[in-house]
Structures are given as structure tokens and as C-alpha cells.
């Protein structure tokens, strides 16, 4: 089979969108979240610190971080109907498929009337997304 050469088509040099959240290749390479290099965040910051940074616009101080971690922990319980759906997903399913299905089911169980509570919904999703894996390894009851 002949190797296919990559063409020159694409978005090279084109602005695809603007956001305050992240930049990709602003200085030629790399990724930043709210001005922080992703490699530094990956090495030194906790998941909750990066989530707080993305959602609130700044890295949390220790008090803000403690409050945010406690808030996320308080939102981790899963409705039984969601647990039932997740348990029926094949063990070999791709994690993104599991998250999509879980998110869709949770959206049917915890209905949003409008966008006024979007920050709370984001925090809820951040709290519950890791739980399917934890349930599989029986860390949680």
C-alpha cells in the first residue's frame, strides 16, 4: 500500500475561535489554561485546582480549594437509576462512551429548566464522572 502524503490543507494560520480558557500553540507550541502552561499544571496542580482555574478564572487559594474539594465530594452520590444504567454498560466500553451515556442519563434525571444553574451542573458533572471507574474497582459501596 502506498503511503499517503499529508496535504497542506487545514487551518494553519487561521483563527478557529477565541476563548479566555486556553491557547494552543500561541508561541508556536504548547497548551495553556488561563495563561498557565499545561505541563506545569499537570506536574504541580491537583485536578480540582485546574477545574477551579478553568471555571472561576484563577487558581484557588488554600481556603477556596478546601471549600471546592468539599463541595465536589458532597455532589458525588449517584441516583440509583443512573447506577443501574452504568452497570448495564459492557465492561469493555470506551470511557468516553460511558461518560456520554452517564451524562445523558443524569440530564434526564436532574433536569435543567434554564442556564441559571450551569455552574452547579458543571460541578455536579465533575463530581460524578470519575465514579463509574471507582464503582468498577469497588472503592465505593
PLM-predicted stretches and their roles:
Residues 1-141:
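Hydrophobic alpha-helical bundle cores within soluble ligand-binding/oligomerization subdomains
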Amino acid at each position: 500500500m502506498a503511503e499517503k502524503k499529508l496535504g497542506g490543507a487545514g487551518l494553519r494560520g487561521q483563527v478557529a475561535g477565541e476563548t479566555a480558557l486556553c491557547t494552543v500553540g500561541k508561541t508556536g507550541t504548547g497548551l495553556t489554561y488561563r495563561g498557565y502552561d499545561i505541563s506545569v499544571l499537570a506536574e504541580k496542580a491537583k485536578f480540582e485546582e485546574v477545574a477551579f482555574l478553568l471555571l472561576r478564572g484563577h487558581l484557588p487559594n488554600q481556603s477556596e480549594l478546601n471549600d471546592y474539594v468539599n463541595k465536589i465530594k458532597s455532589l458525588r452520590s449517584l441516583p440509583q437509576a443512573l447506577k443501574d444504567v452504568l452497570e448495564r454498560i459492557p465492561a469493555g466500553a470506551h470511557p468516553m462512551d460511558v461518560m456520554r451515556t452517564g451524562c445523558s442519563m443524569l440530564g434526564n434525571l436532574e433536569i435543567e429548566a434554564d442556564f441559571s444553574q450551569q455552574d452547579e451542573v458543571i460541578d455536579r458533572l465533575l463530581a460524578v464522572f470519575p465514579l463509574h471507574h471507582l464503582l468498577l474497582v469497588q472503592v465505593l459501596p
